[in-house]
Amino acid sequence: MRIFLILLIGFFSQVCFAQKLLILGDSLSAAYGMQQQQGWPHLLQQQQEDWQLINASISGETTAGGLARLPALLKQHQPDAVLIELGGNDGLRGFAIDTVQANLNSIISLILQNNAVPVLMQIRIPPNYGPRYGQQFSAIYPAVAEQFQITLWPFFMDKIAVDSELMLQDGIHPNTKAQP
């Protein structure tokens, strides 16, 4: 996860010159199962004091929920960039691939209409949904990033999720040891 934060800092500092970053995410960014100050968004804010980081992540959030909240968040905070870390709960609930992709398309369109830089994070789901759904779900993110010509960040949980010492007992959420 430390490498993820270093890359994120580098990207927002040099590529888009972001001074205000909005994180639109779910429990992976909402510090689920730990104190807020132990989660990666808070730790990122501590490392980059010249930024304003707004963590609008909510545990259990879906792409539809994020889309519904986004207009008010954009109006209130007027971010330079928005990191989109959504879709995991859609996948865990078996939502239709087309619906998830349409919601992400709408989220990105809204961000662009508000003159902010969208950054999409790849999301993966556990294999128990079957290889077909899992592959189709994973393919959403590169397709959307390519369609809008935006940055696609790798899923920061890839190496964390395979180490049980870095995960909560639910096997889905990272614990405090996994934070940078």
Residue ranges and their predicted role:
Residues 2-4, 18-19:
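N-terminal secretory targeting signals
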Residues 3-12:
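Sec-dependent N-terminal signal peptides
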Residues 3-4, 41, 67, 101:
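Short, well-ordered alpha-helical scaffold segments within catalytic/effector domains
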Residues 13, 36-37, 133:
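Single-residue recognition of alpha-helix boundary sites
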Residues 17-63, 67-78:
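Serine-esterase "nucleophile elbow" of acetyl-processing enzymes
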Residues 46-47, 67-180:
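Alpha-helical cap/lid subdomain in secreted, periplasmic
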